[in-house]
């Protein structure tokens, strides 16, 4: 705690033994008597360090005393010279000693406190030792009880071992039966596979024989094709002879062609005429439609002129009188509607306030109930914690049983390994069965392919027979043509022209070449198909041989695997026996410990159940009170809901009446708008017509002015009156026209303003309706 004031190094204990503390003189310091005789081991090092620091000071004091005793004369002589130095040194030493004394007193106080603490600790340890002795006695008693329980458990273990041995014997018997059945099934599958392989070999041999026969048939077909080619060369010569006959027939047919050409041209002309008639009819219909439209326009123009004349006859009213009365009515109606809406909003606001007050009251009741529930939940949590503490104690007791459970788990793992080995053996057997089945499927597919190839052979035979029939028919036709040619030659011996004969020869040569190409193609196709069939047969034969080899290898592998599986089964049986013995012993010990723990748990659970029943009775009583309060709150809520429903029905009725009134007013306004639009259209038509009339009047004036000028030249005596008379109507016409235009423009402006005001009012009405719907929706939801 405090750094040493003397030397920095440690002094061995032999130094203190060589210089005991009893040899100190009479004026030794007082701190040596305060050191306790028995010090704690933690503070021995500190005390030794303090003694080491104090040892040099003691030696210095001894030297001073000895020098004072032995040499009094010398000190008296040198007193005058060294008096001042010795006094100063002694004062410094005394000051240092005082500081050391104070420090040592503090350390002594601390050591006393530590000694008291150690005494308290020793007393506590003594108490703990007594408690441990008592616990050992109780543990010995418990051990004796456990030994007795183990003795009973051994009896149970023996019984369990006997039962487990019986079960193992039954399991082994069943396993042997399963193995025998599997081996029999495997042998049967192998026998079936061998029989199938033999059948496939036989089918391959039969296919080879068939292919040899087909090759012979193909050679014969090739020979027949060569013969047919020779016959075709002969038939070409016959066809050249028949060319003359064909030319004669063409000439005969050419004489009758013009009548057909005339009929075709007549039909084309008739179709063209019909198309032109249709186009003309369509044009007529379109012209009729345009005429009708023009007539309608003329009628509308006449009607507009009549209306314009009537309007001109009338006097133009001022613009102030054109304001409609329905705007005032609309404003008054809107004001009344707004007042009603305001009244309804006030009612809704009052209902909302009442509802909010009731909701607040209910929330307060719910909060109080929640507080009660939380208090009950806290009590339940306390009880649960007590239960958890007791459960923890039980778990501490169960920790001893976990060792036994681990041993049981090891035994179970050994048993699982044995089961896994058996499962792996079964899986290997399944794989063998699957391989056999897959080989069977592959053989079936190959057989199907072979059957398909055999099925294609009749089609090839049919094609060959068809070619032979075609050749026979060609022969018959050629013979017929030859006979006809001979007859014609006899009837008309004149030779045909050279050009026709050459053409017929070319055609016959082309037909000959085409027939040769067809025969060559058919022969090539037949050869290709025969080659393909041979290749397929050889490939299938090779594949079947490979499959047979693979099956033999698989059989050998399965036999080896069965032998290894037998060895594994024997090892697994031995391990199973050992594991069953260990499991039986562990089960007995577990049952004993479980019985003991079960009794202790039942006692503790009974105590906890009594406490919980008391607490549950209290909670049930409180819950019944809360349910009563909740029922009261529900009744009040239902009353409030009924009132809200009544208010809602009233508001719906008012809304329906308002909607009906609004619809009627809208219909009336729509009628009024239609009338105004009709008047507006009439006025626009009149304006357009007015423009037309002004143009007509200008043209009329331009036509009339030259005649007036001619009259003015002829009549010189009275030139002014005609001008006045001519200018007067023009001046009269101009102001009237301008006044009419001004009045019409004012009328149009008024109509536009009125339509804008109506549209604005409708928009405002729609917005109010939307606001009212939005305000009513929250009330409905509340």
UniProtKB/Swiss-Prot annotation:
One GO process term, biological-process aspect: protein export from nucleus
Coiled-coil residues: 82-314, 344-437, 498-691
InterPro entries assigned to the protein according to its UniProt record, in alphabetical order: HCR
Gene Ontology CC: one annotated term: centriole
Functional summary from the UniProt entry: May be a regulator of keratinocyte proliferation or differentiation.
Taxonomic lineage of the native organism: Eukaryota, Metazoa, Chordata, Craniata, Vertebrata
Tagged with keyword Cell inner membrane: no
Compositionally biased spans, kind Basic and acidic residues: 62-74, 208-218
Protein known as: Coiled-coil alpha-helical rod protein 1
